[in-house]
Design a protein with these regions (language model features):
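Histidine- and acidic-residue-rich, metal-dependent catalytic cores
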Residues: 2-128
């Protein structure tokens, strides 16, 4: 019997969430691609760390699935007006249900102004 890998769980979750609504995961995939390119270029992370960060970046808006029914399609609303609500829901999800819970704070900070992140650990800052 083969062990289930974190990557397999991530892909299962991503694909299941896409069935509920595609927008957050499609947006997350684009963000993850940009995060990967920027962090790889920076040269501060090993490939396995980049893989974890790409997983978190892909699902950074997972909290949007907890917003009001029907509002998920209004990306401007949950990215701007309700940004803290979906950021906190996403943080709680990753903190409690994730093999990469050490990166959960990046989800909570992903809408915070860069200048306010000065006291935050650089890995969270890079991801946020």
């Amino acid at each position: 019997m083969e062990y289930i890998k974190s990557k397999d769980i991530f892909l299962l979750m991503r694909d299941t969430l896409k069935l509920i609504h595609q927008r957050p995961m499609a947006h997350g995939s684009r963000v993850a691609y940009m995060v990967y390119l920027m962090l790889r270029e920076g040269g501060r992370y090993e490939e396995f760390e980049l893989a974890d960060m790409v997983m978190v970046a892909t699902m950074h808006d997972i909290g949007a699935y907890m917003t009001e029914a029907g509002k998920i399609n209004d990306i401007l609303r949950y990215e701007a007006k309700d940004s803290m609500a979906h950021s906190i829901y996403g943080y709680l999800f990753f903190k409690h249900l994730s093999p990469v819970k050490d990166l959960a704070k990046a989800i909570m900070y992903h809408h915070m102004d860069y200048d306010k992140l000065q006291k935050v650990d650089y890995a969270y800052k890079d991801l946020a």
